[in-house]
């Protein structure tokens, strides 16, 4: 191209056009850029459509191994196996009517699980298949359809409990097993966290004084936990409910309940590694079977405490009246916080009073302060629940009150460990049985002596009459 042609081309390109007075070369550049953008957009649409065509297969395959996300705070306590499958777990949560949509993402380093191919059956989101073996290696993975059938569509008539994070329903599975189904509701993500905590804390735990978790359901926005059904209500209902003038909870039964709770908590504190701090010990979380055996339930707020840690700092949660003062003030949590709550619960069982009751006169509102005052004024016998049919001996009552007062010591370091509490309670139980046996034996001897005296008297009178008849 000659110099003249280049100059002519430059002149033509520099001429203004009718499009906002832009020069010709600018307009050409805009057109070329627009064409490139359109081409890229069409290419992206093409790639997206191809991915969507392949996505259902991938989703179906991943659904077969999807499990509830595992909390970083609660790690699975299992021995190492030869083949471990690092689980980067992400549950795809869809929108379901009347349920809040929420999700939780964890990295592969936060959770690990072990499973073999035979442990996991194919899973259908529609709920057509029955419960399958859990990927976690314990329990069952129930479908939503099965749990809805068991609870009659989660109807209100089957509601047996309700809390801030969920509703508990009574249910019967197809094999006739009675279960309690806890449907967790979302509360700023707390339901998702509570689900993971409960699954990991009590999934593998087996103790006669801890409620047994049978399995769980993860489907859409639903998070459900399936427990053994404990068919005699909870301790709160039997202490504060309308049971008449005389409570069926005798002193012996109440002491057995206290001892059962202590054994369950001792297992959590001293029988597991890392130890488990329940964090919400209260009367409504103590279930009772037909033999009045206590079973600690509701581990949604539980925390793990490793052997290398003396406490864990966390947001203060629990139930007003049961929370240890040092935990409420600092957020520093350890097993001594549970022991404080346990002491409050002992007082509640003995007195039949709530930990905090604003309907009572001034000076009796706070159970701990009132009880300390009564014991200090040598009026211990007056604190016993008037509905107890047969009050305990003074010595037995004072020993149990001593255990309760030691548990609520303001200095957490002075509170006894749960194992020590069990020894004190068992000694008290033995003492009480010995006293009752001594009383019964003493009464029996008195009755025998009376019978002997009466028999001797009758024999003497009979002999005297016989002698008089012979004289006649």
UniProtKB/Swiss-Prot annotation:
<dbReference type="InterPro" id="IPR011009">
    <property type="entry name" value="Kinase-like_dom_sf"/>
</dbReference>
<feature type="modified residue" description="Phosphothreonine">
    <location>
        <position position="143"/>
    </location>
</feature>
<keyword id="KW-0067">ATP-binding</keyword>
<dbReference type="GO" id="GO:0046777">
    <property type="term" value="P:protein autophosphorylation"/>
</dbReference>
<keyword id="KW-0808">Transferase</keyword>
<keyword id="KW-0418">Kinase</keyword>
<feature type="domain" description="Protein kinase">
    <location>
        <begin position="154"/>
        <end position="431"/>
    </location>
</feature>
<dbReference type="GO" id="GO:0106310">
    <property type="term" value="F:protein serine kinase activity"/>
</dbReference>
<feature type="region of interest" description="Disordered">
    <location>
        <begin position="437"/>
        <end position="472"/>
    </location>
</feature>
<comment type="similarity">
    <text>Belongs to the protein kinase superfamily. Ser/Thr protein kinase family.</text>
</comment>
<keyword id="KW-1133">Transmembrane helix</keyword>
<feature type="binding site">
    <location>
        <begin position="160"/>
        <end position="168"/>
    </location>
    <ligand>
        <name>ATP</name>
    </ligand>
</feature>
<feature type="binding site">
    <location>
        <position position="182"/>
    </location>
    <ligand>
        <name>ATP</name>
    </ligand>
</feature>
<dbReference type="InterPro" id="IPR052232">
    <property type="entry name" value="RLK_Ser/Thr-Kinase"/>
</dbReference>
<dbReference type="GO" id="GO:0004674">
    <property type="term" value="F:protein serine/threonine kinase activity"/>
</dbReference>
<feature type="modified residue" description="Phosphothreonine">
    <location>
        <position position="67"/>
    </location>
</feature>
<feature type="compositionally biased region" description="Basic and acidic residues">
    <location>
        <begin position="437"/>
        <end position="449"/>
    </location>
</feature>
<keyword id="KW-0547">Nucleotide-binding</keyword>
<dbReference type="InterPro" id="IPR017441">
    <property type="entry name" value="Protein_kinase_ATP_BS"/>
</dbReference>
<keyword id="KW-0472">Membrane</keyword>
<keyword id="KW-0597">Phosphoprotein</keyword>
<feature type="modified residue" description="Phosphoserine">
    <location>
        <position position="284"/>
    </location>
</feature>
<feature type="modified residue" description="Phosphotyrosine">
    <location>
        <position position="327"/>
    </location>
</feature>
<feature type="modified residue" description="Phosphotyrosine">
    <location>
        <position position="227"/>
    </location>
</feature>
<dbReference type="InterPro" id="IPR000719">
    <property type="entry name" value="Prot_kinase_dom"/>
</dbReference>
<keyword id="KW-0723">Serine/threonine-protein kinase</keyword>
<feature type="modified residue" description="Phosphothreonine">
    <location>
        <position position="314"/>
    </location>
</feature>
<feature type="active site" description="Proton acceptor">
    <location>
        <position position="280"/>
    </location>
</feature>
<dbReference type="Pfam" id="PF00069">
    <property type="entry name" value="Pkinase"/>
</dbReference>
<feature type="modified residue" description="Phosphothreonine">
    <location>
        <position position="319"/>
    </location>
</feature>
<dbReference type="InterPro" id="IPR008271">
    <property type="entry name" value="Ser/Thr_kinase_AS"/>
</dbReference>
<dbReference type="GO" id="GO:0005886">
    <property type="term" value="C:plasma membrane"/>
</dbReference>
<feature type="transmembrane region" description="Helical">
    <location>
        <begin position="24"/>
        <end position="44"/>
    </location>
</feature>
<protein>
    <recommendedName>
        <fullName>Probable serine/threonine-protein kinase At1g01540</fullName>
        <ecNumber>2.7.11.1</ecNumber>
    </recommendedName>
</protein>
<dbReference type="GO" id="GO:0005524">
    <property type="term" value="F:ATP binding"/>
</dbReference>
<keyword id="KW-0812">Transmembrane</keyword>
<feature type="compositionally biased region" description="Low complexity">
    <location>
        <begin position="451"/>
        <end position="462"/>
    </location>
</feature>
